[in-house]
């Protein structure tokens, strides 16, 4: 019976093993680099609520840059949960991997509270040291060191839209308020709002947020395609 040279060629087998090993190393390296890039340099998030409509679509996908953690007025940020649980290293690693493939929609470990246990996307409207008050769902801001109030739109770095619609009279005092008294933010405290001022849960409910809760800034909405935009 005639034998193939591959059956007895030691050098051929070694070369074949090296090719396979190099291919495996290449695939693993690409996967790790991609995972690190999409988790620590630029990662995708899925918007599963209408709290930021109309500018940020429900069921949309946007990219967040975690290096941009010092926002200006009017910019959109990605916030950590209010009651985020401190996890051991192995659980955090599992969360990181699964969360990457789930577009930041699901983590197997940690809080599952629908209001305070999830990440959220909100717009920064007032900075540390600013004074503010709200009237008819529009925030008026007096920047730190200045003497006059301006609307949130006049101070924003880019124009944006908010959603306000009529609610029944019986709703007065329920849900998110459309009026707030004059208040001054403390050091390292930001005031954030949902663009949907009727449905969104934001600083009107939980107050100003610390910078440690800001995990990055939204820079690009990629889906739906007809609403693709840079922030």
Region locations from a protein language model:
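Hydrophobic membrane-insertion alpha-helices, especially the h-region
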Residues: 24-40
